[in-house]
Amino acid sequence: CYILMAVLSAVMFASCEGFLTKPPQTALSPDSFFRSASDLELWTNKFYSDILEDTDIAETYADDMMGSSINTVQKGTRTASSKSWSTPSVDGNGYISSNGTFTPLMNINYFLEHSSNCQDEAVRERYNGVAYFFRAYFYYKMVRQYGDMPWYDYVIGSADTESLNKPRDPRGYVMMKVLEDCDKAYERLPEAWAAGPLFHVSKNAAMALKARAALFEGTFRKYHSGTPFVPQDQETYDGKTISSQWFLEQAVEAAKTIMGKKSLYAGNTMGIAPIAKNASYREFFVLEDADPNETILGRAYKSDEAVTVRHGIQFDMKNGKRSATQ
């Protein structure tokens, strides 16, 4: 009898332990995710909408689109005293919110910490390249807006008060890290993706971002030298002495990497017969598909029901979902 009870108790405890260690049913577990190419693609696809600049062409406070209700502009009641003007939201740290402020950065660093779950090295490194590109883009945007910024290349735990309260890093150090991330992206990204080559970051996109970021920082330091924005024009980080000249040289070298790889659309190269002297200019606005030879990183804007990412406004306007009565 005692033996039977001992056996039953062992079985019961074993079953309870197995139940308690089950993976979460309503949330992603890093141990079971980030294992396949589709997992990595799904996670990194969010970076495009979170970090790239928003270029929606319709505006509910203009004449080209209306929301579900008449707004203050359309009613003629929007005035300075009514305080109905849109202002950017500010989080508790005083940073203007942009899709959750540091949330996109956390998602990038979280991805880089767990992408090693994918055993296919070629796939893993390709999507790591996407993450490095967008971390560089994220910090490039933040430095443009705020100057000095705290640099994080890891996920901050809720109890890590030291990291949460760390002071800002000098903009020169952060921009140096931006260029390093561009180099990491360039090493890992393909020349072009098999599917949607125009709309995925590539080697050319990484070098274009590096050239843009380095040119911005180099000219900023050149024309603000000696001001509180640039206390000293030469700084040394990780053994590198940086200055306005250093950033400008980095911009030149990055630009040289992609020069000659793209060509401007000259017309009549996609099976479309020119109908006028300025046909190429006309086709720039009427072609359904862009010429890939002149595009480094683009977006597709089509009124196609199958296309919903970043094209919802066009979809809504085509189908009459955006109007004064709908």
Outline where the language-model segments fall.
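An aromatic- and glycine-enriched ligand-binding surface/loop that stacks and positions planar moieties
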Residues: 17-79, 149, 200-204, 212-326
